[in-house]
From Swiss-Prot:
Organism: Rhyparobia maderae
Protein name: Tachykinin-related peptide 9
Keywords noted in UniProt: Amidation, Neuropeptide, Secreted
Coarse class of the protein's main subcellular location: secreted
Example GO biological process: neuropeptide signaling pathway
Protein function: Myoactive peptide. Increases the amplitude and frequency of spontaneous contractions and tonus of hindgut muscle.
Residues annotated with Arginine amide modification: R10
Tissues where this protein is expressed: Brain.
Top-rank taxon: Eukaryota
Gene Ontology CC: one annotated term: extracellular region
Keyword Secreted: yes
Compartment(s) of residence: Secreted
Length: 10
């Protein structure tokens, strides 16, 4: 999974 997606969720 892309880290960018996780950061955007926060």
């Amino acid at each position: 999974a892309p880290s960018m997606g996780f950061q955007g969720m926060r």
